[in-house]
Amino acid sequence: MSRPLSKVAPEWWDYTTLDPEILADAAKLTEKSLFKLSRPGFTVHYYDTIEEFYAAEALEYVEAWRKATADNPVGICGPIGPTEQLPIVARIVNALGISLKHAHFWGMDEWVEDGVPVGMDHPLSFAKADFELCFNRIDKKLRMPKENIHFPSGDLKAYTQTFSDIVCDTMPGGQGDTKHWAFNDPVRRKGKYKDAPPTPEEYRKLSARVTELHPITILQNARTSGGGYVANVPKSAATVGPVETWKSNKVSIWQAGTHDNPFGMRLSAWMIAKKIPDSAVPMSLLADHPNVHFHYYRPAIKTVGAEMH
């Protein structure tokens, strides 16, 4: 039986093309049943205050960096979205006097315009946000060397190689409306993928690359980062891929309700917990990663029901 067309963008794959039973099962999850989805390799965490939520995310950076030594460089591959943890990271590093001399950081992604990654003068630049919200706030004597900061904005093969040369302790991130991590979006519904999206095995072969963004992602970034100004959001981005993700010891997804909604926060967890990987829901591919953690701000879980505004 052929899969339905997307309700949002018929020329693309996305979660609206799933078996309706999967969607219905996810929508039924209560706060209690969502928490019980934890299984070996997949752990659900709840936080009752937003302060604790972002402090816990910030501590992941610090805990990873404290493992780094001259003989064993260690890093973290971090997102822009969420960003609220970044100033807290800098404050903890400064307060505890933690030297980042041997620590590393990978930026997950960066916008691309006309085939070229945007510079830090672009208002939506992710590198710009990382430096303004975190790195420039760290005491100069504690900062990591610039060569230890890696963005997917140059030689992407070299960027990928660093994940083999350096231990990526943790890859934290958020979840987008397309159920992506980084910019691992669903693909267009054309060519060999006209009738079915890439298999999980095919999608997992993707490494860092420049990719076309799903219309949902463009709209979301205009809403969350650009005041709704869609014209200012690039249509392509360079992104970390599944290859680098599977070289990371832990994947840690933080959901405060700012980016995805109550249904989306349930759907990806359901598919990971029940091991239903489908590249129309890229986050579901993490069902096959050995160490995934989902962190929720409890008040954002809400319910999947009618709430008129």
Where are the predicted features?
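ATP/nucleoside-binding phosphotransfer catalytic cores, i.e., glycine-rich phosphate-binding loops
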Residues: 2-17, 36, 41, 47-49, ...
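Ligand-binding beta-strand-loop-alpha-helix segment within the catalytic cores
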Residues: 18, 23-45, 98-172, 232, ...
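Glycine-rich phosphate/diphosphate-binding loops that line cofactor/substrate pockets in enzymes
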Residues: 58-72, 245-246
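ATP/pyrophosphate-binding catalytic subdomain of soluble kinases
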Residues: 59, 152-197
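Glycine-rich N-terminal segment of FAD-binding domains in flavoprotein oxidoreductases
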Residues: 67-97
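Gly/Ser/Thr-rich loops at beta-strand to alpha-helix junctions
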Residues: 76-86, 175-180, 258-260
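A glycine- and small-aliphatic-rich helix-loop capping segment at beta-alpha/alpha-beta transitions
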Residues: 89-100, 122, 186-195
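Class I SAM-dependent methyltransferase SAM-binding "motif I" and its flanking Rossmann-like core
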Residues: 182-234
